[in-house]
């Protein structure tokens, strides 16, 4: 109430290079402005703050005369021939069709810069004493008959008293200019009803051999699952069906994730191309921006990156083109910062992968708790169509990722995946031959290893992500120091297990 929001917004937009058009005063002010030779009227308009302007429209013409014009005797003289009703009719620009159209026309003539129209309006316009310009407007659930009659008379709606009492809608005749205009506009927009397509052209799931390398043992070589994911994406670029659809999205840390190789392979999207020689141009993986680039490097804006991910993930519905957006971010900076966007993605039936890279609490401690994520899966679990996984080994990651491609782009299910990948380097075993392992990985849990030396007490140890490796160490300690057997379970998704438990519980009600 103390400020003037239109002026504040004008400064912001002008500072950003926009063309600004302000629609503040309606046509009924024109004569007064023409008669004012002292400049006091414009001065008074500039002095009054938004809180005062709200009161002027809530309290009637006499109040406006006394408190707006009454500040200066010259202004009282200016309106001395006007009744309180005349003063009450002095309108705001945002409710004057002539002024609004003039602003729109002016905006259409502007070239080279975007235009914003800032229009001054009245909260609860047309509601009369039941809500116009008063703070209870937002709590008003319905209008009484007296208020409806006032609304009808004010806007000259051609309804009888009985029709108003029955709360009937007014619809112009089919031959009226209004209906003709609306139908013409609707034809230009493609039809009477918006249409949402749930299916687009199928993207066939890549051949299994693309993922086979990820399912092999790394021997003594230590790797992080983040590194394995990047290798897997590099392999996917060789698939002619999938490669053009991949949209890697990075908010900031491409080199931290080991993704700099993508700069040369598929380029960073830039609508103007690259106008400079990058400082690392002599390196093999130098920075390359391109009009046809596929990588979206968003700068440090998780909200912007998430918006790009949603846009690409809903393109199957909006544009009949399935894209495969893969947004990689520090897992601590995902759902904790942009959880509302993730929920919106569920509402929009977005398809794609969210990768919470460098997850876990076993590394990155040098950067403080800001990177020690151990709870993002709790936040992702509340979104019904988000499938969350926390794999430990490369074969688990490959199995989950391929299943995601199959379910989202071949079966075209309305789900999306959140997968956390680690920063810790360690050896990765080969995928067990047991066929139940793949099913267990996808369902959320499978038996990884059993210790059966003593045939007595047996403890069940469960772990996911890097913590599974600590479970294996714990099993060794239990066996060697306490002579206790154990079963070690790899829990790839506590979230999926919970969903299954809820489903079973509901079924058994």
What does each model-identified segment do?
Residues 1-7, 11-12, 21, 255-256, ...:
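Conserved thiamine diphosphate
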Residues 2-302, 307-311, 455-467, 473, ...:
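Conserved acidic/glycine
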